[in-house]
Amino acid sequence: MTQLQSLRGMVDLLPEQTRCWQAVESVARDHFRRAGLQEIRTPLLEVTELFARGIGEATDVVGKEMYTFVDRGDRSCTLRPEGTASVVRAALQHGLLSQGPQRLWYGGPMFRYERPQAGRQRQFYQIGVEYLGVGSPRSDAEVIALAWALLVDLGVQGLVLEINSLGTLQDRQKYREELVAWLEARSDQLDDDSRKRLYTNPLRILDSKNPAISELLQDAPTLFEALSVESKARFEEVQVDLEALQIPFQLNPRLVRGLDYYGHTAFEITSDQLGAQATVCGGGRYDGLVEQLGGAPTPAFGWAFGMERLMLLLESAASINPNGSAARLTASTRPDLYVVNRGEQAERVALVIAHQLRAAGLVVELDSSGSAFNKQFKRAGRSRATWALVIGDDEAERGEARLKYLQEATTQANPIPIDQLHRLDDVTGLVRLVRE
């Protein structure tokens, strides 16, 4: 019988990887808590119209990449390709915006039918932040600073913050006309992809990965030149606030985001450690999205980072600096104690002891194999536990267990009284019992 495999681009996270992800998520949760954010969780499956209206029908995401099907109720449904539209839909549906500004964060899997490669899968995980109902330029800088501080705290190397202003809808319409006219005069130099986008989504040509197109665009008019006086002044305020926060940034007049709802400030944080997939975090202002989805005009700003790319960066950083924060985050979680036991009476005693020590807060791995002691000790070594608690029928009869330090092969196992183990709340207590 053929062995079943996961779908292409749908990757399993094995226990060691999951522990690393949990460590990163814990750091993110702490940053969000200190910034006063609240978590929101939305369904994986939404009506297709949400993304068609929110993201834009002319985008690659809606046109090429979504997982869409018609369900048994004859409704067109889509696995969410990003998180922002779902968060805004939930805020509208449940009246959150009537309660004042909302500072929300989310995390979970998204789905896009793309060509899988390192750091980019068809099921991918994002952690994102959405500030709804907050419209000042200062809030742009605040939310960007939250992303920057988190990535720095995680130990990511080679970070570069790029910012741009996409202006208002009127600014973009004016620029679109100028850009289309400029590109039409050079249509013979465009590749097939750029020709397709010329009249549907010309701003996306600015983000072309074709080196020839990138070189051609060096002489193209920039969006900044088309911005109104008000849009330029607003963008200047964002830059002043980032400077006040001592966050280095670069202006990138070619920076556009792949979703139609962005306007005014847009940003990306890249790393020189990622190669072609350099962007680790991106976002911006999307003041028109709430209204597009049926709500009142509401300012909003948000960002998201992809966990897969972030983990690639942390693994790279850990290899560069084995003592840094990234190395600590990507290290496997070690059990405090591995319980080695054999014999009918010993196994029951070991079960009770493991339960008591876990309740006291220790990380305890119990060997339930019933195999020979030497095999159990080999497994204890592979677990990377610091200590082994050894119980045989003889020890159980005497009311003792033996504690062995696993980091030195020659260390003797020292007896400790079983009836004292319930007092323990950390491994230091184990060592203290041995000395007593």
UniProtKB/Swiss-Prot annotation:
KW ATP-binding (keyword) present: yes
UniProt keyword list: Aminoacyl-tRNA synthetase, ATP-binding, Cytoplasm, Ligase, Nucleotide-binding, Protein biosynthesis
CDD domains recorded: HisRS-like_core (cd00773), HisRS_anticodon (cd00859)
Reactions catalysed, as given in the entry: tRNA(His) + L-histidine + ATP = L-histidyl-tRNA(His) + AMP + diphosphate + H(+)
Any one GO BP annotation for this protein: histidyl-tRNA aminoacylation
Record's subunit section: Homodimer.
Protein name: Histidine--tRNA ligase
